[in-house]
From Swiss-Prot:
GO terms for molecular function: actin binding. This is Protein SCAR3. It comes from the Eukaryota. Binds BRK1. Interacts with SPK1, ABI1, ABI2, ABI3 and ABI4. InterPro entries: SCAR/WAVE_fam (IPR028288).
Length: 1020
């Protein structure tokens, strides 16, 4: 408190008074001092309020908490005494070792906290008290038409934000869709204008051909000029537009083509027309004839009548000249008349020229009747050879590169509507699989077979050259056979392989060609030559700009019905991969029986090198592709199958399905055994598969069965266990080789011990390795020296650590090898097989010392000539466990008997070398065996006599008893030190004394058994 309280106020209060009036001066001074005191008290009050802020609240809370704590403490005091009484009343505490206290202590469940109150601390509660309230949305209610409280309700309602977010996402999707539509429309417009300029410049190209006029059904098309140099560049784009045209127009050009077929009379037949399903890779089809501009406009202007649709469904076969008429009629309705004139010329040339597929599609050559003269056939022959030469000359034109990368991107933009495109393709496949047989007049119409195979010409140019050579010979042979009217078989072998290098696995393509030459003279005298090509497996990882699409589109309805009736589904027996076991029966593959028996097929299997072994996905991928049949399947044609009528061509199915089915079946049989169902694959019964190139013969069946067996015995499955286990299918299990389970009862005289024994060291990484619990005798306490346990307790030097340090046994794998026939074995042999060997030290040769009498009645096991640190053998088992040994164990007994004899000879030489050994023997040994021991021995001898009367034991049995039974006497105490040898080597003397004493016991047992009760001992 400041001394001058008057200075805290203004001095004018008392200075401005009248100096002559002292009373007024004193009053002013008093008021000034009072004001200063009051101001100072106010400051003190504020300071005290800051210091003692909330102290009263804290005091009240502390008092309340202390009261609650006192109540809880009373509860604890009432609960603890019963627990303490129960704890002190327990006699054993062994059960505490089996409680999960180690895991319980770190995670103490807090059910009720006795020391801390439920309220949060003030340091946590203060931020909640000091935070601001909700936003003052009520200020916006005056701008809302719903009245007061509407803004708070609106902005706190979760549905409002849900609706707002959904509207925003819908707006974004609509904007993106409109943008993509505009971009696609722009690309289509530019592509159409570019194609119009391409078609306009067709006549100015270098590779031009002039074709003669062609007459069919009274209609003649004029001579045109066209070029095929630029077809490969635009092939992908034209094929796409043809598909889109088909999907938009309903059924595609099949409907319009059916009109010409229905107008064709039954008796009429085209003259000198060869039908080809596909041309060279650079050639054009009916889809390429229709330009993109016409395709875009035709779906808006062209309408199909219902009668035409019905005719399309009813008709099953049309020819290229009929398509020419329809295409010409369509071209007249459009604005691009000049382009369509050139397109019609291309179709006319297709009708005039005898074309064929160069290893890509299916080709049908339909010859005329036998009434046609040889000149006409010779013309066809020369025309076919000329066509081959023209195709050879046009190889370089075909191999021209594509336009640019921008064009490829624009083509990729056209595949936006993928779902509709796929649906239209499936409809076209169903619509194009048509064939018709005119059985009324015996006239076979031309069958339409369309196979579209788009491949990169740069990669497969060599296949075109090989195809030309092989087809050149094919044309010559076919026409030569026609002239000579013979049924000579035509063999065509075409190898086409397209290797795509992947990151982890190799992908293979296989092209199979099954050439069937069916020479049959029917009532009309007509010859039919059929060549059917099945495309190879589709590579699934190629770019979309390089579509390798193989469609086999010709199927005969009758052949399909016959083959579907004979085909059996694939059958697989499996246990679902339970515990890694193999199926009880191997996978059985049912081969189709509807194919021609004359066809022979080569099947080659290319095994893939496994990629990184630590990647399970790569292993599964390799397993699924391991069984793909590679290279070529060469089918030798023969006479027609008698089961097929009217010379119908055998149906072709897409080869991709057969390859996927075979790889799926073998892959599933492989994956059932390794990692379960890792990959979703279609089963065989879910697919309609008619593998036309795989005949049913013994070679194929044997080959496939060999593949199946080879994969079942795969090296990755059971290599470590083929030689050890009786079967190849051993389940895997966690490594338990370090575990030892032992059971030692403490209250039994002859305790049994169960040990966990493994078969061998190869089962380290198995999940469930096989093991056996083998009985062993337990050891009693080493300080028990009573006469009752003299012959049943083990050596005092024996301990559990010695069991661990022991080599488990010499025959560690014998019980494992004999586990298959162990049902007839007895429990005693398990005991015997695990007590065949003892530990051998490097310093001294330790082996049991055995003595065998002349009568071969008793053999016992003596202790080691070893230092006390080495373990001694366990006590002998009960008499009922002593059985004869197996032949394998008898061979080991012979070797160990020789060691016993050498050890015995060594011991007696040591004993004879001692000068006073026999004289001081009574003084060295404390006492002879007591009568109780002798009585016990006599009882044992009596039991042995009874067992000997029942069955005469063999020599190996006695040697086994030497190893298994042991008479442990009391420890020998040295009582004299007069012998120099005993002083220098007390250990040997102690051992020799023990040996002699035990030998005396043996002598007594043998003498009592033989009837000789003399106590004299002879070394012989």
């Amino acid at each position: 408190m400041p001394r001058n309280v008057y200075g805290m106020n203004q001095s004018e209060v008392y200075r401005n008074v009248d100096r002559e009036d002292p009373k007024a001066i004193l009053n002013g001074v008093a008021v000034t001092g009072l004001v200063g005191v009051l101001r100072q008290l106010g400051d003190l009050a504020e300071f005290a309020a800051e210091i003692f802020h909330g102290i009263q609240e804290e005091v009240m809370a502390t008092a309340s908490r202390s009261n609650q704590l006192k109540i809880r403490l009373q509860h604890i005091e009432a609960t603890v005494p019963p627990l303490e009484k129960a704890m002190l009343a327990q006699t054993t505490h062994i059960h505490f070792a089996y409680t999960g206290g180690l895991e319980w202590h770190p995670r103490i469940p807090i059910t009720q906290n006795h020391l801390i109150y439920d309220d949060l601390p003030h340091i946590i509660m203060d931020p909640y008290e000091e935070c601001r309230g909700p936003p003052r949305l009520h200020l916006l209610d005056k701008f809302d038409i719903n009245g007061p409280g509407s803004c708070l309700k609106r902005y706190s309602d979760p549905t409002y934000f849900r609706r707002a977010s959904s509207n925003l996402s819908q707006g974004n999707k609509k904007f993106q869709k409109d943008k993509k539509h505009c971009k696609m429309k722009k690309k289509k417009t530019s592509s159409r204008s570019r194609d119009m300029s391409r078609l306009a410049s067709l006549a100015n190209q270098n590779a031009r051909k002039t074709f003669a006029s062609f007459s069919f059904s009274g209609q003649t098309s004029s001579t045109k000029t066209t070029s095929t140099s630029d077809m490969e560049k635009r092939y992908d784009f034209q094929d796409h537009h043809s598909r889109s045209f088909e999907s938009r127009s309903g059924s595609g050009y099949n409907e319009c083509l059916s009109t010409a077929t229905s107008s064709l009379k039954t008796g009429e037949r085209p003259k000198g027309v060869f039908v080809s399903s596909s041309l060279t890779p650079g050639s054009c089809t009916i889809a390429s004839v229709l330009s993109e501009c016409e395709t875009e406009d035709a779906h808006d202007n062209f309408q199909f009548s219902p009668s035409q649709g019905q005719a399309a469904r009813g008709s099953s076969c049309v020819s290229w000249d009929e398509k020419a008429e329809i295409v010409e009629s369509l071209g007249l309705q459009t604005d691009e008349a000049s382009e369509m004139v050139e397109a019609n010329s291309v179709v006319d040339t297709l009708d005039e020229k005898p074309s064929y597929g160069e290893g890509i599609g299916g080709v049908d050559f339909h010859s005329k009747d036998n009434e046609n003269d040889k000149s006409e056939s010779g013309l066809r022959k020369r025309a076919g050879i000329d066509e081959v030469r023209e195709i050879k000359n046009g190889r370089e034109i075909v191999g021209e590169p594509r336009d640019s990368e921008q064009e490829t991107e624009s083509e990729g933009e056209c595949f936006v509507d993928a779902l509709n495109t796929i649906e239209s393709e499936s409809e076209n496949n169903q619509g194009l699989q048509t064939s018709q047989v005119s059985s009324s007049c015996g006239v076979a119409d031309e069958r339409l077979e369309k196979s579209v195979c788009e491949q990169e010409t740069e990669q497969n140019s060599y296949s075109v050259e090989d195809s030309c050579r092989s087809m050149d010979g094919l044309m010559a042979n076919s026409f030569k056979n026609e002239e000579n009217a013979s049924s000579e078989n035509v063999s065509v072998e075409m190898h086409q392989q397209n290797l795509q290098a992947g990151s982890d696995i190799n992908r293979l393509q296989k092209n199979d060609l099954c050439a069937n030459k069916d020479m049959r003279n029917d009532s009309g005298g007509k010859d039919t030559i059929t060549f059917t090509f099945v495309p190879g497996l589709e590579n699934s990882l190629v770019d979309s700009s390089n579509p390798l699409i193989h469609h086999g589109l010709q199927e005969n309805q009758e052949t399909e019905a016959e083959s579907s009736g004979d085909l059996e589904a694939f059958k697989i027996w499996t246990n679902g991969g339970l515990l890694g076991l193999k199926p009880s029966k191997p996978p059985v593959l049912a081969m189709p029986s509807s194919l021609s028996p004359d066809c022979k097929t080569e099947e080659r299997t290319v095994g893939f090198a496994e990629a990184e072994k630590d990647k399970a996905d790569d292993l599964v991928e390799n397993a699924s592709h391991r069984h793909v049949l590679n290279n070529s399947s060469l089918a030798t044609p023969g006479t027609q199958n008698p089961g097929s009528s009217n010379g119908i061509v055998m149906g072709i199915v897409d080869q991709r399905e057969s390859h996927e089915t075979s790889s799926g079946v073998f892959g599933l049989s492989h994956k059932f055994l390794t990692s379960g169902f890792r990959r979703k694959d279609s089963f065989a019964h879910d697919r309609k598969t008619v593998p036309a190139t795989i005949p049913e013969n013994d070679e194929v069946t044997t080959e496939r069965r060999r593949f199946c067996d080879q994969d079942i015995n795969e090296k990755t499955f059971m290599d470590p266990f083929r030689d050890e286990a009786p079967i190849d299918w051993i389940t895997s299990s966690p490594p338990l080789q370090h575990m030892k389970i032992s059971l030692n009862p403490a209250d039994t005289l002859q305790a049994s011990r169960l040990k966990l024994k493994f078969s061998d060291g190869d089962n380290t990484y198995n999940t469930f390795s096989s093991f056996q619990l083998l009985p062993e005798t337990g050891t009693s306490l080493p300080d028990s020296y009573s006469d009752d346990d003299t012959f049943c307790r083990s050596s005092p030097y024996m301990s559990d650590t010695d069991y661990l340090s022991d080599n488990h046994s010499l025959s560690n794998s014998e019980p494992w090898e004999e586990s298959s026939d162990s049902h007839g074995r007895k429990e005693q042999e398990l005991y015997d097989s695990f007590h065949e060997s003892r530990h051998v030290d490097n310093n001294a040769e330790a082996s049991p010392l055995g003595i065998k009498s002349e009568s071969s009645c008793v053999a016992v096991n003596l202790s080691y000539l070893q230092n006390p640190a080495e373990p001694l053998p366990p006590p002998f088992p009960p008499m009922q466990w002593m059985v004869s040994k197996t032949p394998s164990e008898k061979m080991e007994d012979k070797t160990q008997s020789l060691q016993l004899q050498e050890a015995l000879r060594f011991a007696f030489e040591k004993h004879i070398s001692l000068p006073t050994a026999k004289n001081e023997l009574p003084s060295m040994v404390t006492s002879a065996p007591k009568p109780e021991i002798k009585a016990h021995l006599k009882n044992n001898v009596r039991e042995e006599k009874q067992s000997a009367n029942a069955k005469e034991t063999e020599t190996g049995d006695f040697l086994q008893q030497i190893r298994t039974q042991q008479f442990n006497l009391r420890p020998v105490v040295m009582t004299t030190t007069s012998s120099a040898t005993a002083t220098t080597d007390p250990i040997i003397n102690t051992k020799i004394s023990a040996i002699l004493e035990k030998a005396n016991s043996i002598r007594q047992a043998v003498a009592s058994k033989d009837g000789d009760e003399s106590d004299t001992w002879s070394d012989t």
